[in-house]
Swiss-Prot record:
Gene3D superfamilies: MFS general substrate transporter like domains (1.20.1250.20). One of its GO terms (biological process) is sucrose metabolic process. The chain crosses the membrane at residues 21-41, 55-75, 95-115, 136-156, 172-192, 221-241, 276-296, 328-348, 356-376, 405-425, 442-462, 471-491. It is a multi-pass membrane protein. This is Sucrose transport protein SUT3. Its main location: membrane. InterPro entries: MFS_trans_sf (IPR036259). Keywords: Cell membrane, Membrane, Sugar transport, Symport, Transmembrane, Transmembrane helix, Transport. Widely expressed. Highest expression in sink leaves and lowest in germinating seeds. Residues 1-20, 76-94, 157-171, 242-275, 349-355, 426-441, 492-506 are cytoplasmic. Pathway: Glycan biosynthesis; sucrose metabolism. Pfam families: MFS_2.
Amino acid sequence: MAVDMELDGGGDGKGKAPPQISLSGLFLACMVAGGVQYGWALQLSLLTPYVQTLGIPHALTSVMWLCGPIAGLIVQPCVGLYSDKCTSSLGRRRPFILTGCIIICISVIVIGFSSDIGYALGDTTEDCKVYRGPRYHAAAAFILGFWLLDFSNNTVQGPARALMADLSGRHGPSAANAIFCSWMALGNILGYSSGSTNDWHKWFPFLMTRACCEACANLKAAFLVAVVFLGLSTAVTMVFAREVALDPVAAAKRNEGEASGLLAVFKGMKNLPVGMPSVLIVTGLTWLSWFPFILFDTDWMGREIYHGRPDGSPAEVTAFQEGVRQGAFGLLLNSIVLGISSFLIEPMCRRLGARAVWVMSSAVVCVAMAAVSVLSAWSLGDFGGSVQDAARAPAEEGGVRASALALFVFLGLPFAVLCSVPFAVTAQLAASRGGGQGLCTGVLNISIVVPQMAIALGAGPWDELFGEGNIPAFAMASVFAAAAAAAGVVLLPKVSVRSVSMAGGH
């Protein structure tokens, strides 16, 4: 059943209210989201295709992504809980943001130099221009960096969102989430621009080695730029996010007798705000519909649309890499629409209600995922529907490729809803009971990562049953999107117009 609610503002309830911050100050305080998202964009657009060049088969690439859900399941709720109680002089959120960003920098350097690490450990003595075999040491280094990156991303993301809710004040959580979403869009634009650029190796030729040819050097350079941008954005956030530290004595008294660690997280889940369980259910279904595309979008462009293979002939590899770059360009267009749309979400919620906006976005995703499946079948239709057959045939399908890019653009608005509305509703629900922004954000993340675990475990084997393509996963995503829309109509709380714009503190 839907729950009608009138939610008013309220701080976190765990100490002095933060000083009032201007909208421009709030914008600068959120800059770390852009830095983190830059690296995340590179991870999404390039790493699934790249790891296949190291010898990991397509069916196992989704399993590699298990690290994100596992990290989200363990790290974000715990970090959210401890950040609610942190008594550091830097404040509650900034210590976790700073630590996570340092680890992100280390992890992306490991990923960028994974081929060189594997070469040093004895993968091969041949030059990368002639060697086409597996490089398992490089793959191991890559996966280590990949997992470390996901754990550190989760360390930053929960406190960063909670920080925005803490500081939002009179601007409200919807405005804070719109700013967060706009920084994500900017990070995506920069990251996907880097991923779609094929000239990094020309600008930084010293990054090419016997183990690292052009594609590898492009990846390496893009991640080194990510380190610089993340360092800058973290510094700006640390300066402008002026938190008020918790009083250690008062915090100790308040925390006496409370459970700690994961026990506290599960204890907190028993006392969620009214309406939060429904939000968790709909969020889970929504992410089941999105994660196949997030995981395989550039791989889909390389395989189904450009008919390439990461482990095929030189011509097939070239076609695959071109498809991946075009997929990154599609994600760039998607991010531009995301950035524009992020400023439309609050007016839409004010006019239609958060529930209606969320439900309509799920309906759009349902149509889009069905269109992806149809477009893929159309692209492969002349080759018997087989990715392997299509990879050996010439591909001159300008209409199909243009339609594929159009789908990336079409998904920009619902992705803006995904990045904003669930978190804004969660912040309002937390404010309605006087605090716990960090814990509620962490618990919401559980409803995101559990579907991701299901997709990560099942998508690769499921697709392999149908010829190693991505069509079955996208078709199933359309079904989940329809279920999310139906569940949203029945279950989501009806948040008042006033609460959308004003909830979140005074």
